[in-house]
Amino acid sequence: MDYNYHTHTDRCGHALGEDEQYVKAAIEAGFKVLGFSDHVPFKEVHHPSERMDYAQMEGYLESINSLKAKYADKIEIKVGFELEYFPEFKDYYQELLNRCDYLICGQHNKTLDAYSYDLYADDEDVIIYANQVKAAMESALVSFIAHPDYFMLGRNHWSD
């Protein structure tokens, strides 16, 4: 694989290491493109184990853009965000897209208050999940879908 567009930083609470360490490791591994995609921060809510605090967003963008310039002759670096698609935030997502290279949809939660599909997902939840992912694709804001089978973490079997 020559590229990775789904890289988180320690700001999200579930990754380790400094931003530049990821770049150096990607170069060493022969990557041509490294895309950072930390989880979208929200002013309204902060979940330290899921996403950066809203106040960290500027530092994230500055850090990755600085690395993009520093390593331009060695690797293509992109900066983006991973979002859960909630239509009420469509304008906010567009503002973010105007400031970065791409957005991806990783629909972890049914609602912003962190009802997570990895804990439990019954048949009704799977339909809601599918509709949320479909709406994200139809919005034309996201470039691709991350872990489209995420809802299966909360299920032991496929249903009919």
Regions found by a protein language model. Name each.
Residues 1-83, 92, 151-156:
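An N-terminally biased module of ancient metal coordination in phosphate/nucleic-acid-related enzymes
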Residues 11-13, 100, 104-160:
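Domain-core and long-helix interface of multi-subunit machines
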Residues 19, 88-89, 129:
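Amphipathic coiled-coil/heptad-repeat helices and related helical stalk/stem segments
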Residues 23, 56-69, 76, 95, ...:
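Histidine/acidic residue-rich metal-binding segments in metalloenzymes
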Residues 26-35, 95-102, 135-141:
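Short, functional N-terminal and low-complexity linear motifs
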Residues 75-119:
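Hydrophobic alpha-helical segments and helix pairs
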